[in-house]
Amino acid sequence: EIHQSHIDFINNKEKYGLESNMNCSLLQNNTISFIGFGDLAKKLKPLLEPFTNNFLAYDPWLPRKLLEDNNCKINSLNEIFKKSDVIYVLSSITTKNKHMIDKKLLNLMKQNSCLLILSRANVVNFKDLLKISKKRKIKVATDVFPEEPVKKNDPIRKSKNILFSAHRAGALES
């Protein structure tokens, strides 16, 4: 919705008030999931807690107790993609999880759910992501890409259903 609202505004077709929010959703009472529960997820979760207490997590590399101590219900990837309203992809890349988020999982997502890719792009099969985001009503935002910088003729640049940022997260001087 943010992407389309931006385009509408530029083209003098913006909507205001309730009309502009008809297809929007609130975080309140949503199911929010983390794929990868490292430092980033641990910092992000407290910011989301005022909106919901329904958190799911998938991180097979961490002890179950750590996830449970952080009030996350442990779920399989299939269950996370079926149940979640918002999914944060925050995992590191390994030989075992390259392209693990593929068309099978993406097709399980609820209509109007959100997928936010903020860690390593190669955890997601971007070819599948482009196809699915065109066909299904899911919201996608990504700050990372399989190849950076993204080539000028890359098909991802033509996607109207994905919100992009050029790997800005974490790139600050300290």
Protein language model regions, located:
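Proline-glycine-enriched beta-turn/loop adjacent to the NAD(P) cofactor-binding site
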Residues: 38, 143, 169
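Phosphate-binding beta-alpha-beta segment of Rossmann-like dinucleotide-binding domains, i.e.
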Residues: 1-31
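Oxidoreductase and adenylate-handling cofactor-binding alpha/beta cores
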Residues: 1-7, 46-53
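Conserved beta-strand positions in the Rossmann-like core of class I SAM-dependent methyltransferases
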Residues: 56
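Adenosine-phosphate binding glycine-rich loop
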Residues: 146, 150-152, 157-174
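Glycine-rich adenosine-cofactor-binding loop
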Residues: 20, 25-49
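Short, well-ordered alpha-helix to beta-strand connector turns
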Residues: 30, 52, 84, 112-113, ...
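Rossmann-like adenosine-cofactor binding region
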Residues: 62-155
